[in-house]
Amino acid sequence: HSPGGA
């Protein structure tokens, strides 16, 4: 998943 995502 994208960085900073849960």
From Swiss-Prot:
It comes from the Eukaryota. This is Antimicrobial protein 2. It is found in: Secreted. Has antibacterial activity against the Gram-positive bacterium B.flexus and the Gram-negative bacteria E.coli and V.harveyi along with two other Vibrio species. GO terms for biological process: defense response to bacterium. One of its GO terms (cellular component) is extracellular region. Keywords: Antibiotic, Antimicrobial, Secreted. It comes from Scylla serrata. Its main location: secreted. The lineage of its organism: Eukaryota, Metazoa, Ecdysozoa, Arthropoda, Crustacea.
